[in-house]
C-alpha cells in the first residue's frame, strides 16, 4: 500500500506517490457530469486532481466561483479524503478584476492599512508594456514586482486554501517574474502563502508548482516540484498524424521547501492546451508544414483527442513508458478544454451526433455521454506499475552524462565524455536519422567503462544502429567488437511490438554493444527479449 500521509511537510516518497496518481482535471468545477466524474476518480484511484479550479478570464461571479470550488472539494473528499485538489493562478489578468474587492486580511498580511477598494488591473500590468505583454486594453501578463499583483496572487491563494485546495499551479512563472531580478518578490510571496497554509490548510501545507524546470536560489528551491508540458517530434513517414516525445531540459535539484534534498526534483508532465488549433484550415498548408506546427496543427490535448480511440490508448501507454524511462510523472488527461479542436462524436445517451469541446477520460455512457472511454487503459497502466519498475531507466539527473575525467584503471586510457548511438531508429525517438552527433541519443556513463541509453520505440519493425565515440564517425561500433569508419556500417535489431522499451549498452574497453528490450502489453506480463 502506498503512503499518502502528510502534515505541514511532505516526504519525498509521499510526494512521488501523489504524482504517480495525478490527473489533469481542468476546471472540474464547471463539469456537467460531476456524478460520473466522481465515479471515475474513485474507479481510477486518482490522488491528485490538477487544475480542478481556477480561471484564465475571471468568472462573472467571484463568490460563486469560490463557492463552487469549495463544493467540489467537499464532494471529492467525501469519496477519498486523501485526494489533493489543485487550483490555478495563471499568468493572466483582465480588466474585470477591477470589480473584485480586496479583503482586509490581504492588506493586513502585507502590513498595509485596510482600504475599501477593488483590485486595480492598471496597477498589475508591466509599466513598460514589453511586446506581447499587454493584450490590447483589457488583458495583460501581470508583473509580480507590482505590489498590486502580489496582493492579487495572495488573495487567490488564500481563497483556494480556504476552499480545501492543497496545491496551486502558478502558470508560466518565468514570464510574470521577468522584472523580478533574482526572484526576490516571488520568493517572498510564496513564503507568505506557505505561512498562511501552515495555519489554515487542511493538512497545513500547500504544494506549489509552475511551468519551470526549477528555480534555485543559493541551492534552495522555490517550488515543491516542477511541471511542464511534453515536447514532440513529428513522424512524417507513417500513416496519420504521428509523433514521438522528446526530452527537453531537466528538473533542477537542491533543497526542497519540505526539508529534503535531491539532485533532481520530481516533475509532472501533461498534455497542455492553448486554443485547440494553431492552423484554422489544414487544407491551406502542406503535410510537412502542418506536422511542424505545434502538434500537427493542434495544441497537445487537441491532437490527442482527435486521434482514434485505439490510437489514444496506444499513445497513453507510450507516454507512460516514456515518462518512466525519463523519471517523469505522467499527469493523465482526465478533463481538458479542446476549444477549436472540438471533436464530433456519437452521444452515449441518445445515439445522436454531437460536438465535444472538452476531453473527458470517462467511459462513454448515459451518465457521461461524451466520454472518450479511456478509463480501462489508465487502470491497466497504473496496475502495471510493479512491472514497469523492471525497466532500466536513464539517470534521474538527465543533464549529467558523466564520464568527466574518467580513465580506465588498467590501461590509463581516458574514456570519452560524448558517446552517441545513432541509426534509422532515431526519428522514432525524436532525433534526426543517422545523426552521430545527436544530443537526443547521447548515452549516459554509468561506471565500469559502460554507457547506456533507454528509449521507447513506438512502432514495431527492423532498425539499424551504431555507436559513435566522441560523436564522430572515425570509429563506430555495432554488431561485433571491431571499429568501422563512416556512416554505412551498422548492426540491426528487430522490435516485435509497438511501444517497446529499448536499452542500448556500450562497453568502451571491450567494444561491445548489447541491446535489451521490454515490451508492455498491459493485458499481459512484460516480455524481455
Where are the regions that the model predicts?
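Glycan-processing catalytic domains of CAZymes
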Residues: 1-408
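Aromatic-rich carbohydrate-binding modules that target alpha-glucans
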Residues: 412-460, 470-493
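Surface-exposed flexible segments
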Residues: 344, 349-352, 359, 469-487, ...
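Compositionally biased low-complexity segments at domain edges in trafficked proteins
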Residues: 496-528
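Acidic/polar N-terminal loop/beta-strand segments that form early-domain functional surfaces
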Residues: 51-54, 88-90, 424, 456, ...
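Extracellular Ig-like/FN3 beta-sandwich strand-entry sites
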Residues: 460-462, 499
Amino acid at each position: 500500500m502506498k503512503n499518502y500521509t502528510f502534515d505541514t511537510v511532505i516526504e519525498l516518497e509521499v510526494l512521488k506517490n501523489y504524482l504517480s496518481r495525478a490527473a489533469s482535471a481542468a476546471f472540474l468545477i464547471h463539469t456537467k457530469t460531476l456524478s460520473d466524474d466522481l465515479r471515475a476518480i474513485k474507479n481510477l484511484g486518482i490522488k491528485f486532481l490538477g487544475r480542478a479550479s481556477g480561471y484564465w478570464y475571471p468568472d462573472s461571479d467571484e463568490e460563486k466561483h469560490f463557492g463552487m470550488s469549495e463544493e467540489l472539494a467537499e464532494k471529492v473528499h467525501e469519496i477519498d479524503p486523501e485526494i489533493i485538489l489543485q487550483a490555478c493562478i495563471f499568468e493572466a489578468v483582465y480588466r474585470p478584476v477591477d470589480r473584485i474587492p480586496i479583503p482586509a486580511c490581504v492588506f493586513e498580511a502585507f502590513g498595509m492599512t485596510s482600504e475599501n477598494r477593488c483590485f486595480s488591473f492598471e496597477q498589475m500590468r508591466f509599466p513598460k508594456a514589453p511586446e506581447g505583454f499587454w493584450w490590447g486594453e483589457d488583458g495583460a501578463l501581470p508583473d509580480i514586482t507590482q505590489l498590486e499583483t502580489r496582493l492579487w496572487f495572495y488573495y487567490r491563494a488564500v481563497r483556494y486554501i480556504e476552499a480545501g485546495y492543497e496545491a496551486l499551479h502558478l502558470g508560466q512563472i518565468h514570464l510574470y517574474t521577468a522584472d523580478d531580478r533574482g526572484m526576490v518578490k516571488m520568493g517572498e510571496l510564496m513564503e507568505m502563502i506557505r505561512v498562511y497554509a501552515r495555519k489554515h490548510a487542511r493538512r497545513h501545507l500547500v504544494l506549489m508548482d509552475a511551468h519551470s524546470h526549477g528555480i534555485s536560489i543559493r541551492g534552495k528551491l522555490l517550488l515543491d516540484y516542477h511541471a511542464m508540458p511534453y515536447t514532440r517530434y513529428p513522424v512524417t513517414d507513417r500513416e496519420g498524424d504521428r509523433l514521438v516525445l522528446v526530452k527537453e531540459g531537466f528538473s533542477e535539484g537542491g533543497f526542497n521547501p519540505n526539508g529534503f534534498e535531491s539532485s533532481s526534483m520530481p516533475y509532472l508532465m501533461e498534455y497542455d492546451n492553448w486554443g485547440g488549433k494553431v492552423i484554422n484550415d489544414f487544407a491551406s498548408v502542406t503535410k510537412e508544414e502542418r506536422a511542424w506546427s505545434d502538434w500537427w496543427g493542434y495544441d497537445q490535448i487537441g491532437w490527442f483527442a482527435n486521434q482514434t480511440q485505439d490510437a489514444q490508448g496506444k499513445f497513453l501507454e507510450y507516454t507512460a513508458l516514456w515518462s518512466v524511462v525519463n523519471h517523469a510523472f505522467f499527469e493523465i488527461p482526465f478533463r481538458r478544454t479542446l476549444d477549436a479542436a472540438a471533436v464530433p462524436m456519437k452521444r452515449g445517451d441518445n445515439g445522436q451526433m454531437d460536438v465535444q469541446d472538452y476531453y473527458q477520460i470517462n467511459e462513454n455512457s448515459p451518465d457521461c455521454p461524451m466520454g472518450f472511454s479511456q478509463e480501462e487503459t489508465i487502470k491497466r497502466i497504473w496496475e502495471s506499475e510493479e512491472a514497469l519498475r523492471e525497466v532500466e531507466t536513464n539517470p534521474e539527473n538527465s543533464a549529467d552524462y558523466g564520464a568527466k575525467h574518467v580513465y580506465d584503471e588498467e590501461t590509463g586510457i581516458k574514456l570519452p565524455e560524448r558517446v552517441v548511438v545513432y541509426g534509422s531508429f532515431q526519428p522514432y525517438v525524436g532525433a534526426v536519422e543517422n545523426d552521430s552527433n545527436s544530443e537526443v541519443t547521447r548515452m549516459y556513463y554509468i561506471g565500469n567503462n559502460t554507457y547506456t541509453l533507454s528509449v521507447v520505440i513506438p512502432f514495431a519493425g527492423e532498425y539499424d544502429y551504431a555507436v559513435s565515440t566522441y560523436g564522430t564517425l572515425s570509429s563506430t561500433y555495432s554488431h561485433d567488437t571491431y571499429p568501422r569508419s563512416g556512416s554505412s556500417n551498422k548492426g540491426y535489431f528487430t522490435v516485435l511490438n509497438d511501444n517497446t522499451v529499448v536499452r542500448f549498452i556500450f562497453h568502451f574497453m571491450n567494444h561491445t554493444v548489447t541491446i535489451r528490450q521490454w515490451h508492455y502489453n498491459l493485458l499481459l506480463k512484460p516480455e524481455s527479449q
